[in-house]
Amino acid sequence: MCGIAGYLGKKRFDTKEIKKVLDTMYRRGPDSNGFKEITYRKKFLSLFFSRLNIIDDNNRANQPFVYKDKYLIFNGEIYNHLELKSQLKNKGYNFKTQSDTEVLIKALDYWGEYGIKKLEGMWTFFFYDNTKKKGILSRDRFGEKPLFYYHKNDEFVFSSEIKTISKILN
């Protein structure tokens, strides 16, 4: 179980605010946490993550996961990640981790949003392509992994925890 959260709006987070947001997700992932801020059309895209190591406990698998100009925060497990990894290797992709997170970001890089149809498992993730200025927020077909969101005016917030959304907005 991991924790993910994101914010798109005009607010920037200082170090204390980042820690407070990450603290709300600590129980979901005590092994590591991460934060990334990306400027997006005069707004800020802030990605928060708390990690519970399951498949790959190497620090290279920490999140937000970055590949080229793409970013991913992911909670869940892709059961067929080895099959997808093999297909992607045949397309010329190389891998630095054993993580299904790396497989997911490269699957989305190669297949785009159609890569979601290839996934077998349980997940909630946010993928952002900074070149295309396009984001994908996805949840597995059965809703096994939690996902909550808030949208009003120029702010969009999502998280695997409701209390995290509240902390981001305050």
Question: Where would I find each of the regions flagged by the language model?
Answer:
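Cysteine-centered catalytic environments shared across enzyme families
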Residues: 1-170
